[in-house]
From Swiss-Prot:
Gene this protein is translated from: uppP
Name the record gives this protein: Undecaprenyl-diphosphatase
Pfam families on file: BacA (PF02673)
Catalytic activity: di-trans,octa-cis-undecaprenyl diphosphate + H2O = di-trans,octa-cis-undecaprenyl phosphate + phosphate + H(+)
Organism annotation: Leuconostoc citreum (strain KM20)
GO CC annotations, alphabetized: plasma membrane
């Protein structure tokens, strides 16, 4: 029973935080530390590591479901020009993904081995929280240059992708880094969030394939119970992410990202306190 409860809770946390600029990794670690969720035979160390990445696909399916028409170049409801624009958008997404793909392959293991600790996570939560507040204060009197996602240039997509590389540091938040970068480069908040969602599709698919593939190539395997627990987390993450994305996009139509900045600072301080107390272990 606790195996399923743990899967549901982590799925909820993943779905809520994957696309908000607040660090899903940090929140999953916090959830496990604060609630001391017990796990049975299912939750081996190797399975837990794979599970945390696999359920991200549920959140990605939420993006695909919500933006299927916009991202589908084969839609019969689109004109030939609109289909062409969709293909161009996908090429921009690929351009934006390339920096994270290259640096991720080179640095991923190093980051996990040396930077996945309470001090780094708390520091990045706080630093980027401050950055959101500072950038929003700077941007409040500056009109965005890019107000439609199709108007993002290839150069801009590449630079947003370079910001995404920052999210390799635990606690940064992939969506946080890309949204912040896009806003700095002149995108509206709405466009910044949308493009961040689109970038997540190839990135998360790639990371999940890399992690699960590595696990299987090393001789790992899943029991029936583990596959069922993973399926539960996947579905919960999918459903909750649908809700989180809709709420966030409605919110930023008339509000800025400063609330997320303040929230990150509070969570970062909490993370630091728990780390000092020895309650957060990685």
């Amino acid at each position: 029973m606790f195996d399923f409860i743990k899967s549901i809770i982590i799925g909820i946390v993943e779905g809520l935080t994957e696309f908000l600029p607040v660090s899903s990794t940090g929140h999953i670690i916090l959830a496990e530390a604060l609630m001391k969720i017990p796990g049975g035979m299912v939750w081996t160390k190797s399975f837990t590591a794979v599970f945390d990445y696999a359920i991200q696909l549920g959140a990605i399916f939420a993006v695909i479901q919500l933006y299927f028409h916009k991202l589908n170049p084969f839609s019969p409801r689109k004109t030939s020009r609109e289909q062409f624009q969709t293909w161009r958008l996908w090429i921009k997404v690929i351009v934006g993904v390339l920096p994270a793909m290259v640096f991720g392959l080179l640095l991923n293991n190093f980051m996990d081995a040396h930077l996945l600790n309470p001090w780094v996570v708390s520091a990045t939560l706080i630093i980027y929280g401050i950055a959101f507040i500072v950038i929003e204060n700077r941007q409040k009197n500056i009109a965005p240059v890019v107000t439609e996602v199709n108007r993002i240039t290839f150069k801009m997509a590449l630079f947003i992708g370079l910001f995404q590389v920052l999210s390799l540091v635990p606690g940064t938040s992939r969506s946080g880094a890309t949204i912040l970068g896009a806003v700095i480069l002149g995108a509206s908040r709405f466009v910044a969030a949308e493009f961040s969602f689109f970038l997540s599709i190839p990135v998360m698919f790639g990371v999940t394939i890399l992690k699960v593939g590595s696990f299987l190539l090393k001789g790992g395997s899943f029991t029936g119970a583990q596959l069922f627990v993973m399926l539960i987390g996947f579905v919960v993450s999918w459903v909750v992410a649908l809700f989180a994305i809709k709420v966030m996009m409605r919110y930023i139509q008339n509000n800025d990202f400063k609330i997320f900045g303040w929230y990150r600072i509070v969570v970062g301080i909490l993370f630091l306190i728990l780390g000092i107390a020895g309650l957060v272990k990685m």
